[in-house]
């Protein structure tokens, strides 16, 4: 199948402006002899993530204790029993427009975050909602600086919100009151999304769409350091995009960051000093486990890299341009979804494909693990639990 690179990105929920489209070939599904037989144990339908419009929201579920929290773009937020998929409660955040009119979609986006007794979700309409995890009642809602396409992050009593117009804001966890705002300088042309911040040692580490990684003090919102890991280049609009979309990962005093059309880089957590970099570009999140970085590059090549020096351990090219999700760890494999609705299991030692299973329609958000279960949310609104 041949599609434009622009079309492939639109399937991911990202929007580009480009005068010239680059054609890519999507590889056919590889034939895999399954080493084990993944099985669905339950399914649930929450509703499509397009909210009745032309845009798709990458809404990732989350799990806490024995509950899975899911949402769709229209505004439905639900708690499901993790073992059975049974609905425990539902909350409708769609916008009331009058007795004789249909509610407007809340345009929820990014994903659900569960911390303590509350869950949090943000929207493209620049709203952040806090709900009680036990029953779904609304604790508070606030307006922020812009549309929010990444999930809220909760740390040290604050909720971090990274808006698509380049603002990093900290809200009080108790009532949503604004504590501080930092401008990370958004560009006019960028991938429609936003790097999810990560936190460590009292700082927020976040990427931005100008190729920078920034460290910001959580208590006062002061930038401690910034490091550029990607330069603007190329002759087309897409070639000049250098967003740091992937969530930075902090391990053993190192910050691992990844830019589209840029580099995989290891930075010193406390100074931002560049320790090493590799020419690998991506906008999906990476996984760091036992000294190895597992990632999907922007051509959907799956790569394992030594975290100490950036040297490639192995790569898997059988899934090129299948619009892969970020990888997650499942025992001795990493698991990745694709736009054809398949889950793929890849051996962590050598990159061999060891199993695959058709789950649903397109899988564009990262799979979620709960014990021995994999939870996935498909673009058509189906939520599935799978075991190996």
Swiss-Prot record:
Its main location: membrane. It holds the Pfam family PQQ_2. It comes from the Bacteria. GO terms for biological process: Gram-negative-bacterium-type cell outer membrane assembly; protein insertion into membrane. It is found in: Cell outer membrane. Coiled coil: none annotated. The keyword Aminoacyl-tRNA synthetase does not apply. GO terms for cellular component: cell outer membrane. Residues 1-17 form the signal peptide. InterPro entries: BamB (IPR017687), PQQ_b-propeller_rpt (IPR018391), PQQ_rpt_dom (IPR002372), Quinoprotein_ADH-like_sf (IPR011047), WD40/YVTN_repeat-like_dom_sf (IPR015943). Keywords: Cell outer membrane, Membrane, Signal. Belongs to the BamB family. Part of the outer membrane protein assembly complex, which is involved in assembly and insertion of beta-barrel proteins into the outer membrane. Part of the Bam complex, which is composed of the outer membrane protein BamA, and four lipoproteins BamB, BamC, BamD and BamE. This is Outer membrane protein assembly factor BamB. It comes from Moranella endobia (strain PCIT). The gene is bamB.
